[in-house]
């Protein structure tokens, strides 16, 4: 009996493209390979109620005390500046009340030319924040290439794109 197409038979059609070639038609225009190129889209977390209950900013591993209302005003001004320059602004809407650092999105993901790497912060204070970034990326349709797992730790702010071919 001849194989059906589903099992490699005569009507089987093998992909001849690489993932990067599939991006525009399948996933959309996602990907970053530069720290200084034109910014088209950004993922942010507006400082929320998770900042209101912080009493000890050092224990929260923040470098200085934060005034939540001032942080919100500054965030809103930044988001508006992005929009005024044609940048699409998306948000991580959810987090937990005990995760005030979630607003530092750059730590929680790294965009590559082919999609996102969801990181795994080294600090127990930050543990679990990456889930909310992964949810937001999935809702936006951004391909998630990898999630740092096992005993690995990594933060997106630890990387700087120098050359897309490196």
Regions of interest found by a model, annotated:
Residues 1-166:
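The feature marks the mature, well-folded catalytic cores of soluble enzymes
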